[in-house]
Amino acid sequence: MGKIWVLHGPNLNLLGRREPDKYGTQTLDEINNELLHKAYTAGIPIQVEQTNFEGELIQWIHSMGPDDFLIINPGAWTHYSYAVRDAITSVQVPAIEVHLSNIHAREEFRKTSVIAPVCCGQISGLGGKSYSLALDYALEALTQK
C-alpha cells in the first residue's frame, strides 16, 4: 500500500501568525496533527514535510513511490514553479493542490496555478479544512487500490 505525502511550501511554517485574516489562526502543527491522526486511524502511512527551499521539495517528490499520493500546498511556487510541476509529472503519482485561502479571489497573479494542471484536483479557500478534504480523497483513493 502506498503512502500519503503532505508537502507544505514556503512560509507555511508561519501559519497562525502570518496574515491571519487570509490564512487563519490555525498553526501548521495543528493542521499536521489532525492529518497525522486521521491517517493513523485509517491505517495509512503518512509523511508530512515543510520547506522554504524549492530543491528540497523537489527531492521529496522524487523520492515518492508509484503507489503514493501527494497533497501539496506549493505556496507562492504555485504561480511560477515549472520545476515543481515537472517533478510531479516525473513521478506520475496522483496529486491534489491545496490552499488555505481562495487563490481565485485574491490578487491577479495568485489566480494562476502552473501546478493544478498536473494534479487530479485543487481545493482552496477552506482554511485547514482544505487539507482535511484532500486527505479524505487520498485515503479513499489508496484504500481502493
Swiss-Prot record:
Pathway: Metabolic intermediate biosynthesis; chorismate biosynthesis; chorismate from D-erythrose 4-phosphate and phosphoenolpyruvate: step 3/7
Broadest EC class assigned to this enzyme: lyase
Keywords from the UniProt entry: Amino-acid biosynthesis, Aromatic amino acid biosynthesis, Lyase
Catalysed reaction equations from the record: 3-dehydroquinate = 3-dehydroshikimate + H2O
Coiled-coil regions listed: none
InterPro entries: DHquinase_II, DHquinase_II_CS, DHquinase_II_sf
Enzyme Commission number(s) of this protein: 4.2.1.10
Task performed by this protein: Catalyzes a trans-dehydration via an enolate intermediate.
Record-given protein name: 3-dehydroquinate dehydratase
Organism: Desulfitobacterium hafniense (strain DSM 10664 / DCB-2)
Lineage of the species this protein comes from: Bacteria, Bacillati, Bacillota, Clostridia, Eubacteriales
